[in-house]
């Protein structure tokens, strides 16, 4: 009898656990602001694909018809944004969400070379390049953009300038500190 009750209890716990896990699922927001639930998976070569709830196949996520998508399992959020000096939109991964959002553009090319560019925007405004691993472009301009974004917090601005570290981690931590105030 005890074994029977334990089995029932175990099944009930497992059912409750799996029903909660299913409730947290991937989603895509299209250009009409409709939220579509489903499953998102990353291709080995290429980008992410989406299968709507009840659908049978995964399709490439169309950039011109999408605002953002979120992959629950990896907590990855991509938004469609037009980068400065570009005319067509790209998917940018949102690294930090708050008063200042931090986005990452990542492109891999042959020979294990990759480009990482971080952009920031304040209150969903214009994107500014704040950090990059490229040798092109002015580091001073990127720093100035970062300083302008946090200028309304003089204490943080002074601390950031004084630390004189402009690594990817330092930029991310500064934005997190700004957002926490």
Show where each model-derived region lies.
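Extracellular interaction modules
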Residues: 6, 114, 140-141, 166-169
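C-terminal partner/receptor-binding element of secreted or periplasmic proteins
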Residues: 147-181
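Aromatic-patch recognition
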Residues: 29-157
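Residue-level detector of functional hotspots within protein domains
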Residues: 7, 26, 34, 160
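Bacterial Sec-dependent N-terminal signal peptides
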Residues: 1-25
């Amino acid at each position: 009898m005890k074994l029977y009750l334990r089995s029932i209890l175990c099944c009930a716990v497992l059912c409750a656990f799996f029903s909660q896990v299913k409730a947290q699922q991937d989603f895509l927001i299209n250009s009409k602001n409709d939220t579509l639930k489903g499953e998102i998976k990353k291709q080995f070569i290429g980008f992410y694909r989406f299968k709507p709830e009840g659908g049978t196949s995964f399709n490439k996520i169309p950039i011109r018809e999408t605002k953002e998508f979120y992959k629950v399992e990896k907590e990855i959020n991509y938004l469609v944004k037009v980068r400065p000096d570009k005319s067509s939109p790209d998917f940018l991964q949102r690294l930090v969400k708050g008063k200042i959002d931090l986005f990452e553009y990542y492109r891999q090319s042959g020979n294990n070379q990759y480009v990482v560019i971080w952009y920031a925007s304040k209150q969903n405004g214009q994107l500014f390049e704040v950090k990059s691993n490229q040798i092109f472009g002015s580091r001073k301009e990127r720093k100035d953009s970062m300083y302008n974004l946090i200028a309304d917090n003089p204490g943080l601005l002074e601390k950031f300038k004084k630390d004189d570290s402009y690594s990817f981690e330092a930029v991310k931590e500064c934005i997190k500190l700004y957002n926490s105030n």
